[in-house]
Amino acid sequence: MKTIEPEVNLALAAEHGLNAEEYQKIQEVLGRTPTFTELGIFSVMWSEHCSYKNSIAVLKTLPREGEALLTGAGEENAGLVDIGDNLAVAFKIESHNHPSAVEPYQGAATGVGGIHRDIFTMGARPVASLNSLRFGSPKDPRVRYLVDGVVRGIGDYGNSFGVPTVGGEIYFEDCYTGNPLVNAMSVGIVEHHKTVSATAEGEGNPVLIVGSSTGRDGIHGATFASEDLSEASEDKRPSVQVGDPFAEKLLLEATLEAIATGYVAGLQDMGAAGITSSTSEMSARGIEKNGNGGITIDLDLVPAREAGMSAYEIMLSESQERMLIVAEKGHEDDIIAVYRKWDVQAVVVGTVTSDNHVKVLHHGELVADIPAESLVLGGGAPVYIREAVGKKPDTAPAALLPDAGLDLRALALELLKRPNIASKRWVYRQYDSMVQTNTVTPVGHTDAAVIRIRGTKKGLAMKTDCNSRYVYLNPLAGGRIAVAECARNIACSGARPLAITNCLNFGNPYKPEVYFQFKTSVQGMGDACRAFNTPVTGGNVSFYNESTHGGGRAAIYPTPTIGMIGLLDDIDNLVGSAFTTAGDAIILFGDPLLKLEGSEFQVMQYGTPGTDAPDIDLQHEKNLQDLLVTLAEQKLLHSAHDVSDGGLFVTLAEKAIMDESRQLGFQVDLEDCGSGPYRVQEQLFSEAQGRVVGTIAPDAARAVIEEAIRHSVPVRVIGQVVPADASLAVDGHETLRFTTEELTAAYYDALENALHLNELL
């Protein structure tokens, strides 16, 4: 029965998120008015989520070349980096923000599933998962609901799928109350000769859909992700996909076995925009690679979960756990047999053509006929450069009180209880971090997560990071710091930083101040990546992260989340974060100008982050990274932990108590600290960049100092590790003294209390 379709006109195009200029361009491309199905195809492919139309011009300024890169940014489903021994790492980070705002459990779960599919469609087996999460204040009951749903969704999907969740970060700021951020990262390993391209090539080659049946879930999910959240967004729960980790596990194993047959010519995940994006993007890559390509697909052959689905619905469905395969002609039955073995559907639905078009048949009629390149990023999709106007942060400078008027000991303990500082144990204990048995240390015991690479002596380090408060206060410095802190964490673990992926979360790009934040923070990221020789392999842009919750429309803090990988040539060089041995000397690398601007302490004590971010010296950061890796290779570092959120006091406290099986204490005396009235606050709580606290054997001090001098990194001994308890002095004057027990109680219980006992700590 023929589906009755609405009349296609400018008004209907506007309902699909297309402006008048874009609708006119579609008519010019086709030479006619589009069909309803074609309008739907253009609307999702030209959405911000798929086309990057407001961001691609800026993204092209990032460094995208490096000796170890095997694919360029955006060329495939994920970045691919050579790590030697005929092995490569595939890795990528993506957002699932809007779905998680309206349906936190499924939104987060399908975010995890989708990013893993991007990895194994390249032939790589996922070996690790990380995440980066942002929520509003834990005082808000809905925020607690969102946190619970997101954490359970990540944990349930990852645990069931069998990939360890080894790291991540979580922050709480009021600006995320109505618009949480859920960024998921997957890392996989593949032998060079087993990689697969997301390309449609070989005229006459059969095209197969494998995996789950197609339903009505997720229709216009890409469009939903390309608009502002509002109170009406709750009505868009049908745009949120529903995931099945057990189905994806079967799909993974079947796909890797199918690739091993040698009969898979091309492979693409069906993520945003489903069949539409996979057919369009694979066709366009075929044209780019060979000069011709295209796919003709018959929707009558697509396994449908629901009866009576229209061509529009089938093409735009974002049902999960599906992929598109181009098989070598004559071997499609071999591919189908592999999937049947794993009880996974595999059906031939079309063929590769050479006419450079995506053609869609339904009930014997041609319902879409579109030039493939007109649909995709880098082809005919629109590209815009928006107005960018800098705006001073809407925050006040802090009126600091002299040290003498403050109970700094009480404030230090209170700082440990802050949700942004306190242990995230309640979160990561819901994740299986040890499945696959490659995870080297428990979560949080190293500054970067590290897994062993089987069959080699190597280790793979990985980290996600971004302090969005810094980016809000100073987009250029904040973008640089996001990359620098990731690299610093990688180096603290003993690994050399290799490359990054990014997930750029911002507000509405049509607002000049938001586009300025985006453009300027990307510039900062690029500066840092060039300084560290860590090219960008790809990633994701998520605009329109604004909401009407809280009495007015407001954008989130600009949040360019960085995902980074690094390599340990010898896993025995791994360095942990925590103190290891009583009697060790405590050393501080780095000696920047200390100020409280942007710090968690300043927000807690003075109610404002101030008006600027910490300073950042990229050359010093690179020197520090090289020094840390050198010291790890020389087996001179017993531990290393970077100074970041909460400042030096929090770093020392974490080093003392983070290994719950072996807690130690410290005695530290900070000398030559000047005479300013705020010097103790600045020494203990400044988040000045480029600093790391390490521990070494006392007799190694000379060798370490000499190596630091060779690397042009300031270093000084500030104390020693003791069996228990802690004391901190500034210029010989006792300021703080703690028991191990009270540090532990403050740090480990606070977040769970805040989330479940309605206490904002």
Swiss-Prot record:
Cytoplasm recorded as keyword: yes
Name of this chain's protein: Phosphoribosylformylglycinamidine synthase subunit PurL
GO MF terms held by the record: ATP binding; magnesium ion binding; phosphoribosylformylglycinamidine synthase activity
Keywords: ATP-binding, Cytoplasm, Ligase, Magnesium, Metal-binding, Nucleotide-binding, Purine biosynthesis
Record gene name: purL
Binding site residues for ATP: Y52, K92, N502, G539
UniProt organism field: Chlorobium luteolum (strain DSM 273 / BCRC 81028 / 2530) (Pelodictyon luteolum)
Entry binding sites for Mg(2+) 1: E94, N540
Listed NCBIfam families: FGAM_synth_II, PRK01213.1
Binding-site residues, substrate: S95, H96, N97, H98, R117, Q241, E318, S319, Q320, S542
E.C. number(s) listed in UniProt: 6.3.5.3
